[in-house]
Amino acid sequence: MAFPRTLAILAAAAALVVACSHGGTPTGSSTTSGASPATPVAVPVPRSCAEPAGIPALLSPRDKLAQLLVVGVRDAADAQAVVTNYHVGGILIGSDTDLTIFDGALAEIVAGGGPLPLAVSVDEEGGRLSRLRSLIGGTGPSARELAQTRTVQQVRDLARDRGRQMRKLGITIDFAPVVDVTDAPDDTVIGDRSFGSDPATVTAYAGAYAQGLRDAGVLPVLKHFPGHGRGSGDSHNGGVTTPPLDDLVGDDLVPYRTLVTQAPVGVMVGHLQVPGLTGSEPASLSKAAVNLLRTGTGYGAPPFDGPVFSDDLSGMAAISDRFGVSEAVLRTLQAGADIALWVTTKEVPAVLDRLEQALRAGELPMSAVDRSVVRVATMKGPNPGCGR
């Protein structure tokens, strides 16, 4: 996926101008795996300035793995510690994050980050899921309300304006828009977060919202593949089953056929059991589900080579009732996701230890890790100060 020049420039600006290293020596953390992310330890790390394809050769195995993690942070100190000590690829601004992190601390954390630019992500859909409402002018309308009351162009303009406010704060990734197709009541798990029950309407309005974010220099992430709209429940509370794959192809999956072609864009895979596709595994941990997304074979879509994110692996019972965070992270990477997402930092040392063990044991191929690192590097764009 080609990373647009404008988005790369904005990413560099957010990270400020810091020195880069062109050396080929792999980087690594000098902290022990048992160190707490809450205790910052200054670990100088050279910036990696190669083209994306050359980045894996510059990183230690642990730093490669760290680039595949995005974790929720409580506050600036928590973010500083996990970035400095463990060089994680990204942080998530969640419902529990102290928003004073945007008072200047975030810019310092980004400037002093790891070998690649730090991804700063958020769930900012508008409506009832609006993490930044106090900073960007309120919640804004829900997706359903937008589709009922605005034109496609108006939705693009709204998303661009909100995206610009997010970009000024330092946000680089928004886990939006919701691409689920549903007519479920507003207050259900997806409900009014969806643009509607007609796949064509969802495609048009979600596409406009995603383009508005791109216009602002924020990466949109489509969710929740392969479709939560007709799921049996709420994956926050337990396992969720969708209709069979054959039913999803003509409905829930329709928007992805178009929207995955509109790069740059990411896709979040949901914790959804899909008869005829995933067996008893949720899609987020299923090789078959990620392969469906990657190849497009089976639902009439083109191949997708952009970044694939898991849904939250720590705070949703569809996963946490079955696996600890370390095992869930390993399984989502084994399935082919590029980026494992969860909402706390305390598990990071144990996760990295487990992933390194999996590399040594051949449970997780280094070739797959390298491919994901290249996708992550492409998504982030060039390091600031690297002369590009």
Curated annotation (Swiss-Prot):
Residues binding substrate: D123, R131, R193, K223, H224
Function: Plays a role in peptidoglycan recycling by cleaving the terminal beta-1,4-linked N-acetylglucosamine (GlcNAc) from peptidoglycan fragments. Acts as a regulator for GlcNAc-MurNAc levels by cleaving disaccharides and allowing the breakdown of MurNAc.
Protein name listed in UniProt: Beta-hexosaminidase LpqI
Source organism phylogeny: Bacteria, Bacillati, Actinomycetota, Actinomycetes, Mycobacteriales
Source species, domain of life: Bacteria
Lipid-conjugated positions (S-diacylglycerol cysteine): C20
Signal peptide: 1-19
InterPro entries tied to this protein: Glyco_hydro_3_N, Glyco_hydro_3_N_sf, Glycoside_hydrolase_SF, NagZ_Beta-hexosaminidase
Localisation: Cell inner membrane
Any Gene Ontology biological process: carbohydrate metabolic process
Membrane topology summary: Lipid-anchor
E.C. numbers: 3.2.1.52
Pathway(s) of this molecule: Cell wall biogenesis; peptidoglycan recycling
Class of enzymatic activity (EC top level): hydrolase
Keywords of the record: Cell inner membrane, Cell membrane, Glycosidase, Hydrolase, Lipoprotein, Membrane, Palmitate, Signal
Catalyzed chemical reaction(s): Hydrolysis of terminal non-reducing N-acetyl-D-hexosamine residues in N-acetyl-beta-D-hexosaminides
One Gene Ontology molecular-function label: beta-N-acetylhexosaminidase activity
